[in-house]
């Protein structure tokens, strides 16, 4: 089943035409739009609460090892945020799933494999959007903050989060071509969401835990701050 799905996704990589392009209406026009230089930026009307709810569900599935649920959540998140065609959404979701599965084992994970999968993810976004970023660099920055979060996750709970925040800000700054300082608050709130998530994992991943609401709220603040930071003056 794994090989069949992988082949189907690869078969779709060469398709072009209307179904292979980023939608310029619907969800994309409400959430993401080109600004000035053409960089995809969060729309002013981005629903930070909705995106946070979707990503929080993704985190819950990841830490509970519920990979089918993770894939379903990834499809909803990617479709909602990027407005890709359904084919491209499924392909991007598969690349994200494979990256996280390769990253998940501790301590013996496959960081290089995770980077390759994320490079495929970002290459797909670049193909669909036409944006001038380097998929390999975006993947490197992405997996770097995964690495720093894992170090923090398995160290003292009160250890310094500045390196993690710096890595998140670096990814945002690269993706949206803004100064690190402009997106630092968004990075700080995302790091806070991870702190709540780590506490939730340590406590046993209880679906009734109030920590889920706390990390969802921090993610919402992060997305709201990010959307505000990358808008033109």
Report residues per predicted region.
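Repeat-mediated protein-protein interaction surfaces in helical alpha-solenoids
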Residues: 27-43, 72-76
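A conserved position within tetratricopeptide repeats
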Residues: 71, 78-82, 122-129
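Extended amphipathic alpha-helical interaction segments
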Residues: 118-199
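Generic helix N-cap/helix-start motif at coil->alpha-helix transitions
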Residues: 47-55
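Hydrophobic/aromatic side-chain positions at a characteristic register within alpha-helices
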Residues: 62, 103-106
